[in-house]
């Protein structure tokens, strides 16, 4: 029994690392003939369905390089038949759970209430992790992480007042599908199946009741193709891989069950980029192989672009991380050593003054002690020159400074100054801190796209008193046992290297109202109604 329990914990650690996508990928290449599929000539009663392929950490330059080298023929084919937008603004923090929540709800974290991959709940008085690194996995309650990731994220943490695209599709009387996406809440009842060894050896139940889209596929927990088993093995990350996603999408196509909207997530590129850096194209090549399998399910690629609309996109960029640990990493525990910081994996103690939640190149620092001065804490943080942004909230205002800076920027929503997205603001102080150019009461953003709204969204994403810090490109934040990506790359920050993603659209001449992920939802709903 002890062996079973230990093995189950190992399995939990492996799965809980999947959401972070920080583990090196060792999967074999995709075999396109692994599941024979009959060509589909009529896709149910849907006129022209939309298939959205989200490739984790897809960026413009490596995408173009993969196409130029002839190693991404499927993406090249769609590129030649569609419209390409190389710079779409992501959400903030630039972490998948927050970005996907923004895409599905059309709101920033101040409304959808998913602050990041890790955050502190003042209501539950505990840390929330939707994924973790291997060292963290030895200290954190893994069953709780799994429960948070597969159940609470969608069923309790994601704000019920912000409707997801799947919920709105259901209210319109239309079906939608989610394949391996992290955020998928909808209105149809489903049962997620927990692997038997894990449910027998941990407090986790054998089944979890959830609500999702009409068609829900989520790794080993729920699948559409009843005979697909190989891609759900432990060595294939329990189904959280590109091939599983592709085969599930191909199954819908071949059985004429494709709904008006299908959101399909290809996770593996993120792992390659984390390990090898932002210039690598190996993950894109693998994603392209998976995409080929989806296109082939139509019988030909020509039929694929004639019978469906295609949206291929990334969720965040990544910044290269320097190879030397001492230079690249900023240990928040050392900087904040005068304070008592809560220990990872342990209940919050009455004596604890701070909780730190790192999200790679960004962190939330929570003040638990009501007598602790955020101003004093910020002054201590300012001693570190590698901090790009340091922000706190005062009433309705966000106050911004930076490492080795003596100036501040204060702003709030509403006012006489307007930006490119028709958002209005009142701003005082040093505009250079957020690289803002203001002329004739109009804001032009620089290296922090949509900086005011995105930072405001994170600054108002949860209860409590806290600071937000991000680091300059080349650097990464660490605390107790948090993962690092030395010589590779990481994301999480507000900087453009983490924030800009490509968008490839085939089958429609329309585009989102603005080139921001927050505006994709309304556009996708319009496509579903055409």
What are these regions (language model features)?
Residues 239-253, 260-262, 269-310, 320, ...:
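A long, amphipathic alpha-helix that forms part
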Residues 64-119, 177:
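Short, structured active-site-proximal loop/turn typified by the sulfatase FGly-forming signature C/S-X-P-X-R
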Residues 24-83, 94:
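Active-site-proximal N-terminal segment of extracellular/periplasmic enzymes that hydrolyze or transfer
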Residues 161-163, 351-511, 521:
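Active-site neighborhoods of enzymes that stabilize oxyanions during catalysis
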Residues 298, 305-306, 314-367:
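Acidic/histidine-rich catalytic neighborhood
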Residues 26-28, 107-108, 113-274, 429-432, ...:
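His/Asp/Glu-rich, glycine-adjacent segments
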Residues 18-21:
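C-terminal motif of bacterial Sec signal peptides marking the signal peptidase cleavage site
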Residues 2-10:
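Bacterial N-terminal signal peptides that target proteins for export
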